[in-house]
Amino acid sequence: TPPVYYDNTLYAGVALSENHIPGGLVIAADATTGAIKWVFNTVPQGPRDDGWEIAKDSWGDGQKVGGGVWTPPVIDPELGLVYVNSGNPSPDYDGSARPGMNLFTNATIALELETGKLAWYYQTVHHDLWDWDHVTGPLLFDVTKDGRTIKGVAAAGKNCLMYLWHRETGEPINPMVET
């Protein structure tokens, strides 16, 4: 994806492949030297990847593939966060090789700008079999609800739904009922 520039750093999402290659990446690089500052793998492969403790059991013993980042990241300098939307797990047509929820695919992910550490995530489709990942980059907005202003982030999915979260915490702005 095209990189986003902020404070002498380039932030880019990477979609390595739809199939057969582990995870998508979010990379921060020094805009002057090109030196990599940090890397976040949307499908953690082992204990060295941030988020491994949260995601490891969500793949069972299956292959950990997919999660490409197809759209540019979005930066909130006030909160010190960068937001990305991750793609579907792979293969998307046959989930038998990847039991579980398959974190952090089909998710909006907030990372700390300076370190790339996971701040929060929200997975919209668990164990996706339908290729229902997000089709847009994250959108930052402010909205007034019950008389107070909420800093929000939105994502649109291929399932024709628009998801809205609190930018700082990842909590849904409106209830999201799973059936």
Predicted features and spans:
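Noncatalytic, solvent-exposed loop/strand surfaces
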Residues: 1-179
